[in-house]
Regions:
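N-terminal leader/targeting and assembly helices and adjacent pre-domain segments
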Residues: 1-175, 271-276
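Acidic, glycine-rich two-metal-ion catalytic cores of nucleic acid-processing enzymes
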Residues: 175-176, 180-276
């Protein structure tokens, strides 16, 4: 809903702004269309140049347009902050659930000590658990979105597109922004899940439990081929899995290559061998 609202706001702002220049832009656009119909190359080139000049003058070269883009990207960055805040609030819960999941192993002669979410939050805040909350780099976020908005605008101008068609182009940027947020959220949750499991395995190992870790891939068309290849592969607690993109300690490992991490939905499970 957050991103749908942001997309709608962008469209409304664009429409309101462009309506104030509609007469001259429509004239330039219609002139270009007539030139194309005529088939006269010189007329087409002249009309295209005039269309580009007119459009750029009311957008990329206009201070009011620049202010609109700045306001829009600031709001998009704020939406990203809100969305990331939701995820940051959830990751301690995700970590806790997956840490405590080791108790389900029901190993004879071994009682696993559960942790609570408040304790996990305290450990995260004191850097005793490597699960730091993510933050939005506002400047970088705004710059990225402004670049993409202006890039879509330029492509539309160079293609000689109408105002409504360019408006649809701009909406793809908010879709990209939403997809990026979903990817980051999925990656953070996967990392929290498997970091919780990894830490629970380490605790059990320190108590004398001998085990290995098994990679569990998600079996569908969205799973990376190199993660499917890792499915069922067992390694020691301090051993990484390896593939063509390097080493990875667990699904969602923030120290691994991004190609091994982003959008990953894999997990790990303990394979208990006995006691030391």
């Amino acid at each position: 809903k957050l991103y749908a609202t942001a997309s709608s706001d962008l469209y409304d702002k664009w429409d309101k702004y462009m309506q104030s220049h509609k007469k001259k832009l429509d004239f330039a656009y219609n002139t270009l269309q007539e030139a194309k119909k005529s088939g006269d190359k010189d007329a087409i080139n002249a009309a295209q140049e005039e269309y580009e000049r007119t459009f750029k003058n009311v957008t990329l070269n206009d201070e009011r347009y620049k202010a609109m883009i700045n306001e829009t990207t600031a709001k998009m960055a704020h939406v990203n902050e809100i969305a990331l805040g939701y995820v940051n609030d959830e990751t301690p819960k995700v970590y806790t659930l997956n840490y405590n999941a080791f108790a389900d192993e029901k190993i004879d002669g071994y009682d696993f000590t559960l942790v609570n979410e408040r304790a996990v939050k305290n450990l995260i805040e004191s850097d005793k658990i490597e699960l730091p909350p993510k933050k939005v780099d506002i400047t970088k976020d705004q710059r990225w979105n402004a670049k993409n908005l202006n890039s879509q605008l330029m492509q539309g101008i160079l293609q000689g597109e109408s105002i409504p068609k360019i408006a649809k182009r701009l909406q793809t940027v908010t879709d990209m922004n939403r997809n990026s947020a979903i990817r980051n959220a999925r990656t953070m949750v996967t990392g929290a899940e498997n970091k919780g499991r990894q830490d629970s395995f380490k605790k059990a190992e320190s108590d004398g439990v001998i085990m290995k870790r098994r990679w569990v891939a998600t079996h569908d068309e969205r799973t990376r081929a190199w993660h499917s290849d890792l499915d069922g592969v067992e390694v020691g607690l301090d051993e990484p899995w390896e593939n063509e993109y390097g080493e990875i300690m667990y699904p969602g490992d923030p120290t691994a290559d991004p190609a091994n991490v982003y959008n990953c939905r894999c997990s790990i499970r303990a394979i208990v061998k006995g006691f030391a």
